[in-house]
Amino acid sequence: MLVHAHPDDESTGTGATMARYANEGATVSLVTCTSGELGEVVADDLAHLRGNPDALGEHRRGEIAEALRELGDIRHHWLGGPGRFRDSGMAGEDTNDAAECFAKADRDDVTRAMVEILRAERPHVVVTYDDTGGYGHPDHIAANHALMYALGPAADPAYLPELGEPWDVPKVYWMTLPRSFVKDVQAAGIEGFEPFTVPDEDITAVLDGRDHHAKKLAALRTYRSQVSLDDGDFFATLVQDPRFAIEHYVLVRGERGPGSGPHNWENDLFAGLD
């Protein structure tokens, strides 16, 4: 199961991982926390969506449905239902303080919604952002908190038993990037890429998804409101490099499975599970 903040985040950050496991026949589920109502609309033929958060949210809900069809058989949940939690906007914007935004949502409401999904899906592995949100986006941070705060209650039989049988998630990973990756893409002439990274030795798992790079790109192309892969900017250049389908994770809950290489990286998120 993967927990993401907005439509397109799942394809950008974990698209190859999702495609790999869907192709292998694993049950893959996605939780999307908001509809991305405040995203920047990049396609001029969709200019009517600019400044219209409700219309953009509805449009992006359609885009994610197309993207998931490209990635494979993915079970999709909107946290609390479609539109329940709203986009907070980029860090530092006035919208971060809106009462209805995800970053300001009542923790009990968010926890209840996440526990209900965890107990229904009963995942063996859950993936989300690190506690910085990857690059500090308020909704990414809130998505991390939504999952991490729900893990204990989901496993507690005394917590809202009407939400289903308790479930204790065996392994939780946070998405990340190793410092060596950033050096590699800079050496290849791709500039402007300054995410939060970690030392290579702190990485737990590396999934080489280059065999699924085409699916990841196909999913991203469905997000016409948000992404252009043909304008030659740094993001378009980056994602079309097959190395963009190598996805990196840090284990934060559960036992590390067998790995390989100088850093003993797992190559399977289910490593060590029966």
From Swiss-Prot:
Source domain of life: Bacteria
EC number of this enzyme: 3.5.1.103
Residues spanning the membrane: none
Cofactor field: Zn(2+)
Entry's Gene Ontology molecular function annotations: N-acetylglucosaminylinositol deacetylase activity; zinc ion binding
Keyword hit for Acyltransferase: no
Annotated InterPro entries: GlcNAc_PI_deacetylase-related (IPR003737), LmbE-like_dom_sf (IPR024078), Mycothiol_biosynthesis_MshB (IPR017810)
Cofactor note text: Binds 1 zinc ion per subunit.
Keywords, alphabetical: Hydrolase, Metal-binding, Zinc
GO biological processes: mycothiol biosynthetic process
Residues reported in the UniProt entry to bind Zn(2+): H6, D9, H140
Top-tier EC class: hydrolase
Annotated catalysed reactions: 1D-myo-inositol 2-acetamido-2-deoxy-alpha-D-glucopyranoside + H2O = 1D-myo-inositol 2-amino-2-deoxy-alpha-D-glucopyranoside + acetate
Role, per record: Catalyzes the deacetylation of 1D-myo-inositol 2-acetamido-2-deoxy-alpha-D-glucopyranoside (GlcNAc-Ins) in the mycothiol biosynthesis pathway.
UniProt family annotation: Belongs to the MshB deacetylase family.
Designated name of the protein: 1D-myo-inositol 2-acetamido-2-deoxy-alpha-D-glucopyranoside deacetylase 2
Protein source organism: Saccharopolyspora erythraea (strain ATCC 11635 / DSM 40517 / JCM 4748 / NBRC 13426 / NCIMB 8594 / NRRL 2338)
Gene from which the chain derives: mshB2
